[in-house]
Amino acid sequence: MYKRVLLKLSGESLGGPAGKGLDTDSLSAYAKEIAAAAKAGLQIAIVNGGGNIFRGLQGVGKGFDRVDGDKMGMLATVINSLALSMFIKDEGIEAQVFTATPMEPVAKYYMRDDAVKVLERGGVALIAGGTGNPFFTTDSGAALRALEIGADALLKGTRVDGVYTADPEKDPTAVKYDELTFDEAISKHLKVMDQTAYALCSDGNMPIIVFDMNATGNLTKLIKGEKVGTLVHP
């Protein structure tokens, strides 16, 4: 069903059960899923969050300037991308980290054509550093990169199997949506992504699939056209 996707992973997901730091079991499990999908023919670019290390907005009111705090958060995404890339390489798949601002020799400066070349030869492109600007979330960065590389869909990997009427971890009566339009998600105040990311995806006709990244085989199922998670579309 999909040939090329942008996979968005939260920083907390890389931090394991505690959501802090880097959890090698989580990194290894995600790398195996990503590598299996890549070997099956899916072209995958990845944008990681940085909340397991630092999030700029959390520093406001604690002595951190928002602009500098966001810069620290962007650096956290680079650390996460470098860590995940190593585990992907261990699975026999090329993994190249790109950054939104120049950081050679740590990683390559992001150029759309260079990232696409990695995808076309079967590798994984990890695009770090958000948009390179403060006040933009990594969700917005993921939406931007998905549009730039011509992805068929933006996949948001979470720890729940889709979008619900309420938080299923807190409300046992919450009901899962199989499909939603952007307008429905906004009107129902379902926080799938922030408004800027929504606007980018809506304007660019970029579908979003919210799914459980911790369930083995979900990425490969998407390639086969199987229904996984919740589809949010224009």
Residues of each region from the PLM?
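C-terminal catalytic "cap/lid" subdomain
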Residues: 1-234
